[in-house]
Amino acid sequence: MKQGELVPVSEMARRLGVTRERVRQMILEGKLEGVRLGRYWYVREREGGRLRRVYTFFTHAGGAGKTSLARDLGFELARRGFRVLLVDTDPQANLTSWLGVREVAPEETLLHLVDTGQLPTPRRLSEWGLDLIPASLDLARVEVRLMQRPLSTLLLRTALRKTEGYDFVLIDSLPSLGHLAALGALAGDGLLVPVETSVKGVEALVGVMEAAQEYREALEQVDPRVPRSFVRLFIPTKFDARTLGDNRVLEKIAGLEDLAPVASPIAYRPGPHRRATERAVPLQLVGDRQAREEVERLTEEFLQRVVAQDAAREGVLEEVAE
């Protein structure tokens, strides 16, 4: 962009999940460029366009709900007017198929990135208001190629930094600690970690936290702005409030607040999730009010406790006052 676009106060506040009062404060502090036109104030976006955030859903434990969360959070953000790109890095391609995409050529996947250094052209999913870089079994070949090339796990991060036109990029990482998982994890501003409210879920956190620290240390060599905790949000999943065991595990997960925010739990709802998978639609569209409200609540917590905090920490809130 030559000169930043002028955006109304309410629109910028909505984009970042902050109040207009917070926007006014940023203008008064001189951190924003406010422009008055008649009775109304606008903010001029910085050169380079809209604020883009990249987050990776990550855990090496299968069955924690990582892929469905990526699908549903992405759809909810798109419904609110954000421009969203989903990236499927898992050769099992569950995110791809759960959004109704069946036939995928190798050059449409991240195999194209590893071969050429360029992102493939995303698929436009007009029905959901999303863009998707899909996956297929061909993506399994990437693991070996990444092992043979030094620093290749930063390819996706580098390519996404050059990509314009999105407010959010959400990456669905495969349940692994290998090179392909690292490609997805290192691409983001941080990790969104689903934690099943079970003994297995808590035990898996040890490996997740060790990997997160290693990723952070690696990124610190190329980007000094990496946050102290590379985990940006813990999301308790498959929670059954009726069981003593789940409630005890939830208490343990709540104790992680010193490391990163802990979202409200996502309940165990096998029926709605099965219908969403069978119909290849986001969870919000299967007619279960409680499931829809949980995703809406998670989205609010994500915007308030992760996105707004990250933007404030970096001092790049690009919003407006009225």
Curated annotation (Swiss-Prot):
- InterPro entries cross-referenced by the UniProt entry: AAA_dom (IPR025669), DNA_Partitioning_ATPase (IPR050678), P-loop_NTPase (IPR027417)
Q: Does the keyword ATP-binding apply?
A: yes
Q: Which GO terms describe its molecular function?
A: ATP binding
Q: Which UniProt keywords apply?
A: ATP-binding, Chromosome partition, Nucleotide-binding, Plasmid
A Pfam family cross-referenced in the UniProt record is AAA_31
Q: Where is the signal peptide?
A: none
Q: Which GO terms describe its biological process?
A: chromosome segregation
Identify the residues that bind ATP.
60-67
Give the similarity note.
Answer: Belongs to the ParA family.
Reported function? Probably involved in plasmid DNA partitioning.
Q: What is this protein called?
A: Probable plasmid-partitioning protein ParA
Q: Which organism is it from?
A: Thermus thermophilus (strain ATCC BAA-163 / DSM 7039 / HB27)
- State the encoding gene: parA
